[in-house]
Regions:
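A short acidic, often aromatic-flanked loop/helix-cap motif at beta-alpha or helix-coil junctions
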Residues: 110-115
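Conserved beta-strand hairpin/beta-sheet module of binuclear metal-dependent hydrolase folds
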Residues: 1-17
C-alpha cells in the first residue's frame, strides 16, 4: 500500500503506510540495511483487515524484519474505526516495547518527535 524510504546524508527513514504483514518487510530490510527509523502503523486493526492493517502481533515481527534501529508508531488513538478500544494500540505498544526489546517512539497526538 505505498510504503517509501527517505534517505538523507545522515539517515534512512522508512514509512510503511497501511498494509498487512508479509515477507516484504524482510525484503525491504535486506535491500535497505541500516534503517534508522521505521514508521509503522498500529491501530484500527481487525482480523478481517489483516491484509491492509498490521495486527498487533505482526508489528514486532515487521520491526525485527526491517532491522530498524528505532520504531515510531502512527495510525492510533484518533477515532474508533475498528472494534478494539481506542487506547488498546498504545497499551499493546508498551507491552511490545518491553517484551520484544524494541526501541520505540510512541508519540501522543500532536506531540513533536525529533527525528
Amino acid at each position: 500500500w505505498a510504503s517509501f524510504l527517505i534517505k538523507t546524508p545522515s539517515q534512512k527513514i522508512y514509512m510503511a503506510g497501511d498494509g498487512g504483514y508479509d515477507s516484504h518487510f524482510e525484503e525491504i530490510g535486506k535491500r535497505f540495511p541500516d534503517i534508522d527509523l521505521a514508521i509503522l502503523e498500529n491501530g484500527q486493526y481487525n482480523e478481517g483487515w489483516s491484509l491492509i492493517h498490521l495486527m498487533p502481533s505482526d508489528m514486532a515481527k515487521a520491526a525485527k524484519d526491517l532491522k530498524a534501529k528505532k520504531i515510531m508508531t502512527v495510525h492510533h488513538s484518533k477515532y474508533a474505526l475498528a472494534k478494539h478500544p481506542w487506547n488498546e494500540p498504545l497499551t499493546n505498544e508498551k507491552k511490545m516495547q518491553e517484551q520484544d526489546s524494541l526501541n520505540m517512539m510512541i508519540p501522543e497526538i500532536g506531540e513533536v518527535m525529533p527525528l
